[in-house]
Amino acid sequence: MQEKIIILDFGSQTTQLIGRRVRELDTYCEIVPYNKFPKEDPTIKGVILSGSPFSVYDKDAFKVDLSEIRGKYPILGICYGAQFMAYTNNGKVEPAGTREYGRAHLTSFCKDNVLFKGVRENTQVWMSHGDTITAIPDNFKKIASTDKVDIAAYQVEGEKVWGVQFHPEVFHSEDGTQILRNFVVDVCGCKQDWSPASFIESTVAELKAQLGDDKVVLGLSGGVDSSVAAVLLNRAIGKNLTCIFVDHGMLRKNEFKNVMNDYECLGLNVIGVDASEKFFAELAGVTEPERKRKIIGKGFIDVFDVEAHKIKDVKWLAQGTIYPDCIESLSITGTVIKSHHNVGGLPEKMHLKLCEPLRLLFKDEVRRVGRELGMPEHLITRHPFPGPGLAVRILGDITREKVRILQDADDIYIQGLRDWGLYDQVWQAGVILLPVQSVGVMGDERTYERAVALRAVTSTDAMTADWAHLPYEFLGKISNDIINKVKGVNRVTYDISSKPPATIEWE
């Protein structure tokens, strides 16, 4: 059985980042609500307590009885997790004079403590807290300080229990990964045997046992998640998998043909459906973004349902749901707050059982599995693309002419990113067709044509994103190419908004 680290989530914005850092150590972990610790699980090797937006003094602060965990498993408390353990053992936690947020340095630490093995002197750590541990119980030992925080880390004497006031999971903590490695590998004894190859081997075996000779249908989007799910299922059940790829008319230029060719080269049984007439008719005159999304979502369900019913004896619906979707579908108390299904409503409407072979993976792990499966790199590294496609990059109503303009402009931009070696440096990129026209001059004639905005962002998880600082020379060439080659466009702008406050997509 796969050994694991359990991360108890107290509501921190960086809880998923803890999970990703542990997985990067080739160690399997699971994130569970703070009050849902899985008892009697022999595969658990250690426990990490996350941070929290609460103070330990808040009436609604998340609290849990750790008596059944402490002494049985090694524990690492991060920020609120460290404060909570100190506070519940008669230590003192007090509001800081000012909230400490940002870089700090460990001015002193116990070099002989296993948690700090290999950590450099004066190493930078990331702080984000309003409360500070000001006193610890007699059996707690201070093991690190910063210039502003006296008790930056502690260990319970004689126990494998640590607390750190800083966030080792955050990129800005320079030796954060080393600290987590020390806990996960040296303290908990994890074997670091979680790999794409081991995941594929175990998942294929599980899928064969789960699905048997049943038939499965899967909706493909052209994105990495559904594509990797399809290849994995194909390895497990072969001809019993049927994939459906619906073209709603708002894909990127030549995308339907190119993606279908990719899928056929991968040996997948794929049904391609051109439903563009239906979608354009239903979207005619619609300008409100959310209504556009709902029309496309419902239309996809209708088309998919019709095609799936043409396949006899289908028992399962497969989806490319990944681990962050599953985590986000639960509130901190474990109650459902939104469906994580990639295609909302399909399982209920079609009365099919649900199969989600990637539900344990983060996005970067999905790509690693795709490479292990031998999938082409251009498919694995594709940027995220919204389900409604270019419909949410056309501000205002949707027409075939607007889609044509946007497809041509987007094709020039994306190909340019590839040609300049910039594509893999950005998280997501695309062109937005603006609902305005501007005056221009071409030759000796005055023009009054459309404006487009280029968008490119850098990110690690899409929760936050910064605008990509692309070279001016590149932007100038792309602007010139679009204006000269795309009929109907005479102005190109570049969006330099970050998330937050803006979102990655405009609609």
Curated annotation (Swiss-Prot):
Domain Glutamine amidotransferase type-1: 4-193
GO BP, sorted A to Z: GMP biosynthetic process
Keywords of the record: ATP-binding, Glutamine amidotransferase, GMP biosynthesis, Ligase, Nucleotide-binding, Purine biosynthesis
EC number, as in UniProt: 6.3.5.2
Family matches, as PROSITE patterns: GATASE_TYPE_1, GMPS_ATP_PPASE
One GO molecular-function entry: ATP binding
Pathway: Purine metabolism; GMP biosynthesis; GMP from XMP (L-Gln route): step 1/1
Keyword Transmembrane helix included in the entry's annotation: no
Residues in the signal sequence: none
Record bears the keyword ATP-binding: yes
Name of the protein in its database record: GMP synthase [glutamine-hydrolyzing] 1
